[in-house]
Amino acid sequence: IERMDVPREYAIQATIFSEAPGGCSTGTSAAVTVALIGALDRLTPGRLSPHEVAYTAHAVEVEMLEQQSGIQDQLCSAYGGINFIEMFEYPYASVSQLHVPNSIWWELERRLALIYLGKSHVSSQVHEKVIAELEDEGPETPRLEALRGTAEASRDAVYAGDFTALGQTMVENTEAQGRLHPDLISEDARQVIEIARSYGALGWKVNGAGGEGGSLTLLCPAQSYVKRQMLQAIEDESSLFQNIPI
């Protein structure tokens, strides 16, 4: 409200709800901030573009709350859908929306699963660890190049509707995260990955900054009954593990 400079004559009551637990590594804080800024923008003279909404939300987290934050969560929330984001100079980025046939949309919805590991985390702490580890290597370090490559490969796989390639890219991304810092792949995440692997999952990705708690995204096998068995096995493994509907 302070950032948007809402006229003082307005009394504001905001109600916030999300299916995703807080600290779930799914960009919930960015999504909430984007939604509030979009709503408050209706009360102010200007009309912000999606890009402007995203950068205002980013400023709230970085400048006002003094948190470490990328810009991708805010951009995804502001634009919606599937996006390919190129960050050419932090925090500046361009957004290309991926338009795919309904058949690919529906298959993604059917195959993807979100597993909450039962503990929230503060991603800023993990960001600080990674920054400290990499600051002497520079932006062109091979460890970062590996992550950049998976973004392009996953974009191409989605366009092609190639779920095997998409799953492999998710696995490569997770392995590249682990090479950035060992703390990014927790023991709980490794447990879930092993169960998913045993059921023939095509891919798995530690979400967000990784570390303790948070969540994983799984790309499930084609057979729905195998997906159900896999999710049940994951939830049976620990009372902390929870399948979040998406």
Describe each PLM feature range.
Residues 1-6, 43, 55-68, 74-205, ...:
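C-terminal nucleotide
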Residues 11, 21, 110-112, 213-215:
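Short, solvent-exposed beta-strand edge segments and adjacent coil->beta transition regions
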